[in-house]
Each structure stands twice: as C-alpha cells, then as structure tokens.
Amino acid sequence: MDRAGADMWASTFTLAMAERKPQDVWVLLPEHSLVPGCLDGGGVQYLLVGLSRLQCGHCPGTWDSAHVHVLFHLWWDRASHRGLVKMRIWGQRCRLCPAPGDCQVRPPGEQPFLSRLVLHILQDCYGDGPGPARHPREAYEGCCEACELGVCFLQKAPDPAWSANATKGNFPATAWGGTGTVSRGKPLSTPGDDLGKGGVVIAIPFSLVGTSNDQVPIAEGPAPPAGASLPVTGSCEALVIGQGSIFLSGDSVAMPGGKGFPVAIGDPLFHGPGLLGSSIQTFELKGFLFKGRGSLCSPVGVAQGWGPISLNNGLVPVGKHTPTVFYCVGLSASGEGSLTFPSSLTSIFTNTLSEPTDGPVATKEASITFPFIFTDVKDAVAEVAEGNGKEGGGQGLVPVGHDALPETNAGGLPSQVKGSLALPFPADVQGKDAFTDITEGKEKEGGLVTAGHDAPLEANAEGPITVSEGCITIPFAVFDVIKRKGGGHVAYGPQGNGCFSQGYYQKRQLRSRFHKARCGCRREEDERPGRACRRPHAEPYEDFWIWVSMTVCVFWLMCMCRLNPGIYPQQV
C-alpha cells in the first residue's frame, strides 16, 4: 500500500470514529509487516474477508476480488480514551504485469471494511449495538498472496502463531464482517473438506459380527452422523471380503488395548466426486497408522493428533512419517457402518508399502487401523435411546448425553467432540473381546474397565457404555480389491454398484453415433453376462437428434427436387 492509500484508510477511519465517539481519539496505522497472532498489551485480533476492487501499483489494471483479507490489531486504553489500530491487507497480484506487483484497494473499496471495523469497536470496546452478522466466505485459489505465504484464513488450519487473541486466547474464525471465535488449536477446516474437492470417494461398508447375517448390506451413499440410520441400502447384498475389528472407548486419550469386536467387511463402493462434500457431518480424525499381526514393537511414529503409535511388521520404515489424510467412520444403531475416504488414500498406502523397508512386508497379514472420535450426535435417534438404552438388551449404538470432552488430547489433537455414544452389547456377541479403557486407575460405572482387563458382558448388560472415540481395523486385502476394480469404476446416482467406468460411457456414445449400439451391447453381454443386465441403454437424446437430422436431410432433398424439376431428368 502506497502513502496515499495509507492516508486514505487512516483519515476515513479517524473521521468515522470521531463522528460516533468524539471524546475519544482513535488512530489507524497501516503496517506491511503485521504478523497474525503477535499481540502485546492485551490487543485484540480481528479479521475481515470480503469483496473489493483492486488496482495494480505498476499498471492501470483493475479487477474485482472476493478474496481480499484485511487484518486488524486493536488496542484500547479506556483510562486515557485512546485507541490504536494496526492493519494489513492481503490482495492479489496483477496478471497483466510480467513482474509481481503490489496492489491496493481502489476507492471507495475501503468503506465496507472500515464500517465493519467501526461496528466491531463500538460493540466490543463500548458495548454499543449488535455485532455484524457472520457470513463465511468460500476460499478462492489463484494469485492469493496469503495462500502463498501460508497464512490464508480460509484454506488451511491456523499456525500456532495465529492462536493468540485478546485476553481470551481464542482465534477469530473466518467471518464476513464478524468475530466468531473457535477454541485454541482447533482447525478452521470443517469435517469432510478434502472429501468434497473432487476425485473418487470410496466407502467400505461393515457390520458387527453377530448383529446381521453373513452378508453385509451395501450402503448407497456417504456415512451418516452418529445415531442416525445408514443411507438406504440396496436390494442386493455384497459378500464379505474380509474381517476386521472395531474398538470403542470412553476416554479421550485412550488407545486400544485389545482387538475389540469383530466386524465383517463388505465389498468397497465407488462414488463420484462431490457426493460427500456437502453431507458429511460424521466422525473425523487426521492421521492414520499401519498395523500388522505379531508382537508389539516400540513406537516408531506418531499419528497426527493421536499420540504414540506402534507400527508393526515393518510396514513403515523407522522414522518415516505418514501423511495427513481425511476419512470418515459412520456408525448406526443397528451395528452397521461404513469407512469413507478419498481414492488418493489407496495410492498413498501402495506407495508406502512399495518402498524398501527394514523388515518383511506381509501385505496378506497386514491390517490398517483408522482412529476416530465422535463429533456429532445432535441428530441421534431418541426412540432408540429410550428403548434399547434403558433396557440394555437391544443392539447397536445408542446416543446418550452431551458431555464435552477435553478440547485437546495427549497428542495435541483439537478435539471436536460434541457428545458421546452408549453401546449396549449385543446378546449374540458374548465371549468376544470387550471394550477397554486403558487409562490407568480409572473406572467408570458404565462397565468400562482399566487397561489389560476384559469387561464381562454380563456386567455391561445393566446399562449402556458411554463411548467417545475408537478405531477400526481393516485388512490390507481390501485395498487389493480396490486396485482390481480400478479408480475409473465410479457409480453415479442409483447405479451405485461400482461397475461402470468412465470409458464405458464414452464407448457407448460412440457406438450410438455410428448406429452400432446394439451390436456392441451383444458383444459385451457375451463377454460379461453378469453385468449386462445393469448396463444402461444408449442415451435417448442422441438417437432423437440422429433421426431429426435424417428427416431434415430427406425433406431438403425433396424440396430441391420439387423446386428444380429438371435436375432429375438431366441426371438420368
């Protein structure tokens, strides 16, 4: 920002505050080196993201941007009636200039930002009037300077330096003219952000062994929130392709001490891009861990936000850190659930296992454990809680209460726990490994016991067990099935069986254009009779336009012959 632009912002702000609080003196100082989170003397940090018109400092080019960041640091001395505001603007580079050039807000683009700032000061410093409404804005990519510096308020979780604010120690959430705050260390990203950015999404259905038949129903959609029912299942059923285990715990920092309950793993389902971005409100945790059968090893890695992790059977080299990924685990009151993750996770596992390791890689015996925490039980099924939960003889997960857990656990994970679940044990899974609470010396009345002890199912039948987190372990063979199906087998709409590839639809379109749809369909039916019944017919609109084109051509020829009757005899 040049000198003229700085004077314009300062004078406009000073006049606005003088009109409302003439007895006080407020000064605005633009500062190019202002750093988020570094406040001294009880200052308050305030962020605005909005639409403005930018002007290049080297050329006369101007453009509109909805991704303009303005950071304010405020200090208010009530005794001396003096206030100080420091500000910094993050704009965008000019696309017309060959060299990156500074930009500034073109007048009168500063008016909306300063008006919001004045309203914020009047509310927080003087207690006058309501605060501005909050309207979160969508993150924009491109030439954003804040994104390149790693300080973008919208796209990434805040750096620890951004966690400072006022006297409360909270970070201002991204707001359009607002000051909503989130807890220290809590990421700004919402659940399922990475699942809705495009690409294929894979869902692995599972069910508790003993709560259903030997087959696992196919869930035709994303994983639902805790306590809610799974999406409508299809009429057909998928055979079990493997067996894993699920562990639930009532402690926010507990790690599994046993196998937990066995679960039957169903055939993976492929979904198109964007199916989960707007509907996922389930359980999520950054990070994952590899785990194999055999004796436990000393911890050689740390899963982000979870604490020490044991990596077994040499699946991951010592000192190698696993990347951060997003996934969701959905559970229902019937004991069924699904593990949902982007298809890129498959390549991450494959690349990790393909690298040379110090020990043998036994992929057939290997398993992968996904830890998770319950984050949303507000939409729980009340009748299930009243029925099965009180009697203790029903099956499945029953939501109870809304006891908040600590905001961060041992590994520094920003816990987003809003509630907990209660699990009355199924009657026909007796004799299996029980859930354990590995917090030493801690005992709960719900039936959870200390580390290393199996909880007797008879004692648990008296009441539901409150759980707040857990982990699910699936065999690595599931990813072999995913690789065989391929990333191109994406199901859209009601045909959610993962049998159709994108290339298949392109071939169908070409066959329809050259009037070979029927012949091609017969050849495919002979090769793969099991899938022929599920394949759609050629697009009707293509055939329609073909017939329209032919009709127009015939009509044109008839008109030409009628208008020029001598053409035909001459040709003969």
Swiss-Prot record:
Subcellular location: Membrane
Pfam families on file: Zn_ribbon_3CxxC
Transmembrane annotation, as ranges: 544-560
Keywords: Membrane, Metal-binding, Transmembrane, Transmembrane helix, Zinc, Zinc-finger
GO CC annotations, alphabetized: membrane
Zinc finger boundaries on the chain: 3CxxC-type: 52-148
MF annotations from Gene Ontology: olfactory receptor binding; zinc ion binding
Recorded topology in the membrane: Single-pass membrane protein
GO biological process: detection of chemical stimulus involved in sensory perception of bitter taste; protein insertion into membrane; protein targeting to membrane
Entry superkingdom: Eukaryota
Protein known as: Receptor-transporting protein 5
Designated gene of the protein: RTP5
